[in-house]
């Protein structure tokens, strides 16, 4: 049997998918702008 791949951790989630992580790189800012343009309610986790 294989283990479950989703092992939740708030810290890991924020560091990889959080708003400040997105703002830190040019591509991350692209992601945020794309989500703004699409009209997403939540921009990041």
From Swiss-Prot:
The keyword Ribonucleoprotein applies. Pfam families: Ribosomal_L34 (PF00468). One of its GO terms (biological process) is translation. One of its GO terms (molecular function) is structural constituent of ribosome. Keywords: Ribonucleoprotein, Ribosomal protein. One of its GO terms (cellular component) is ribonucleoprotein complex. InterPro entries: Ribosomal_bL34 (IPR000271), Ribosomal_bL34_CS (IPR020939). The keyword Ribonucleoprotein applies. Coiled coil: none annotated. Belongs to the bacterial ribosomal protein bL34 family. This is Large ribosomal subunit protein bL34.
